[in-house]
Each structure stands twice: as C-alpha cells, then as structure tokens.
C-alpha cells in the first residue's frame, strides 16, 4: 500500500503542551491557512498525472472503475484521509453507497468520499447574485469556507460573469465544486423560463463539465403531475430549480425535459466523470409542509433515476429537505434509504422550526445533527442570512462552524472510529487547565481565545486554575482536583 507520506494527505497537526500530537481531518490542502497572492494563479494541479493515465477511457466516473475492481489513486487517497482501507472505499463506491466526486478537468481537487459509512461531510454554498459580489470576493469566500472546514462548495451564482466566476473558483479549489446548471441555462434565455429547452441545458452542462465541475444538482424529479400536489402548501415550491422547472412544465403543459432527456444528461456525466446530485425540487419550505405527498412522490422518481444513473456507472447522491420538525426527520432517512437503495443522502439542514430568522444556522444545525446521526452522508450548511439575504464572509464562517459541530456530533452518535478522540483530548486539557491546548483543539480557536481573554487577558491567566465564570474559589474542576489530591494523600480508595 502506498505510504501516506508519498500521497501527502492533508492533515492538520495539533501539538499539545503535554507532548501529544493530534492529526485532524483537513480540507485546506495546499492552501494551509494561506491563499494565492493572485487568484488568477490558481493552485497546483494535484491530480494531473493520475488523470492522464486514464484519459482514454470512455467513462471517467469513479463508480466505473470501482465496479471493475480497480482501486484508483483517488480512492486510495480518500481512504487514507478516512483512516480506512482503500478496498472498503472501492466497494462502497461500487455498490452506490458512497461517491467520490472528481471531474477529470478538476486536477486541483484533493479527493474525498461521501457516504454514510464515512465521516459526515458538510457543503458550503457561495456565489454572486444580481445585487452584489465580484469574482475576487467569491474566490475569497471559497478559501474562507474551506479554512473553517467545508468539505465541498457549491457555486450558486446567478449574477454577472457566471462562467468566469466559476472558472476561478475551480482553479482555486482543493475541494469538490458543485453547481445547479439550470441557473446559468435560465440566464442564457434572459430569465424567460418558457424559452428553456434541452439543447440549451445540455450546452450549459457541457460548458460547466468542461471547466471541471465535480457534481451537478439536476431537478429531474419535478414531474408535471406532481405540481398540483403543492397547491395547498403554505410555502408552495421553494427550490429555485424546482420552481423554474415547474413553471416550464405548466407553460408548455409538457413533462420536465430533464426527466425525458435524462439519458442524454448521463452521457455528459460519463464523459467527464461528473457525479449527479438529484435535486429535491419539491422539498418542504416550511414545517407545515414537511413529509407531504409532493415531497415523497418526487422521492419515488429520484429512486427511479438513481437506478438509471447506476446502470451507466454514474455516481449519485440524493438531495433532501428542507424544513422538517424533529419528530419527522427519521422518516425522511428511512424512506430515502429504502427508495434510493442507500445512495448517499445530502440534506439542507433540515430546519426544525420556522420562528427564528437570523438564527437559522442554529435551527438547521439541530436538524442536521439528528439527520446525520440517522445516516445522512453530507449536510448542506445554512447561514444566519438564510431567508434574509446574501451571506457575507462572517455568515459563511458561522454557517460552516455550526455544521462542523452538527457533523461531528453525528459522527460521535454513530460511534465512528476515532471521532471521540478530539473530545477526549479537549476534556482532559480542560480539566487540567491547559488553556492554550483547549484553544488549539477547538473548531474555532480564535473565538475560544478571544472569549477567554475578554476578562483575563494576562499571560499568567493561561495557567490559572479558573476562568472568569467561577473565579478562583468556585471552580468545580479545581475543587475536584483538590478532592482527588486529598484522597491520594489519605490513601482513600474508591469502593
């Protein structure tokens, strides 16, 4: 087996004051806390040689190679990142239970795997709008999201310079990049939904695949007969892609062209090795609409489309809600697992209550932790700006951190190997009042240190056996240490 050192697996090494060294899963890769001086320089083409060796194959999907029993360099790399055997990664991809998004034209990518038997991953959405954001700002948001731990990033740009924005995001990204191609297709017809057609869509798909997009959200499950099922919903159709296609279906009174031409879409996927993320265009946008007939009818169609994609050796993940109260979350996972035969589930939250605009990174992280525990493979983050506006850098950070917490909580609940190690190290540092180690082991060391130092900024307080909450006389952990010391001196044994 190829050694980790040769593969240069991107771990973040945290060295503690007691000599312990902890290596955490790391998404920055070659960026490692920095970014190129000029985004137009991009980052190194990490996979270039690997891709060239397979360039003459007709299918570039990792599933294609996995089904042939071939362990690709990408599978080996992802396996080392997960501390798992490469053969296990290959077998999970071959049966469709995991995907490894990796377009042949995104050589900068550092491979990772998405599946319920691996670490729960998180996605961050970036992208401009008609109102704001430059290319440079979006590349900066990309680096910022990756810095805080985003495993994949989706470019959802709907404003100016969509093609160029996406190009520089890809050339600067060590993580998989996803898009929703229908957005750019709509821009090509100047926002007139009725003018969309399969030719324009396939042209857009080819353009984005040629650039190197690793996975596409395709809303092929929004069928004409499902649209009336949304009539009595409080919030109707809340997916942008879903609403675009529903409007097209009604305008022409024809079936969704993404559904009727799904085989042509798969040909593009196969050519470039793009993974498909089957979009939930009829997901619930409010608690009242959760788990309704419209949502689950579409899910049945997504199960059908999954089988069609797998026949062509195309990797598939299934997108999910949305807005779901806690008591209905498990049903979503159980049904998706059954209908889509364990294809990875990729959910937006879900948000568990609708009463907290400005805090939906919290309302959704609650649902995300639960649905991750039940088996969801990747969680799409929600920022504090959800339902209110375009997120800025700080919103992106808050969303990513909230979802890193949710994903890790899910890994702990699932008993994922090694998930508890960091918790144990931090708990030990906390009990021993090793403040600097606590900061280093935190998901957000900067914030942890800032909060501690607000009232106790002096260096000597970094070894103090108390914080500003309890002071020197009321700290329970300090008192416990004194109790243990007393018991040891008196040779008092635990009965």
From Swiss-Prot:
Zn(2+) binds at residues 323, 387. One of its GO terms (molecular function) is 4 iron, 4 sulfur cluster binding. Its cofactor is [4Fe-4S] cluster. [4Fe-4S] cluster binds at residues 467, 470, 475. InterPro entries: ThiC, ThiC/Bza_core_dom, ThiC/BzaA/B. Binds 1 [4Fe-4S] cluster per subunit. The cluster is coordinated with 3 cysteines and an exchangeable S-adenosyl-L-methionine. It catalyses: 5-amino-1-(5-phospho-beta-D-ribosyl)imidazole + S-adenosyl-L-methionine = 4-amino-2-methyl-5-(phosphooxymethyl)pyrimidine + CO + 5'-deoxyadenosine + formate + L-methionine + 3 H(+). Its EC number is 4.1.99.17. GO terms for cellular component: cytosol. It is an enzyme of class 4 (lyase). GO terms for biological process: thiamine biosynthetic process; thiamine diphosphate biosynthetic process. Keywords: 4Fe-4S, Iron, Iron-sulfur, Lyase, Metal-binding, S-adenosyl-L-methionine, Thiamine biosynthesis, Zinc. Substrate binds at residues 125, 154, 183, 219, 239-241, 280-283, 319, 346. Pathway: Cofactor biosynthesis; thiamine diphosphate biosynthesis. Catalyzes the synthesis of the hydroxymethylpyrimidine phosphate (HMP-P) moiety of thiamine from aminoimidazole ribotide (AIR) in a radical S-adenosyl-L-methionine (SAM)-dependent reaction. Belongs to the ThiC family. This is Phosphomethylpyrimidine synthase. It comes from Leptospira interrogans serogroup Icterohaemorrhagiae serovar copenhageni (strain Fiocruz L1-130).
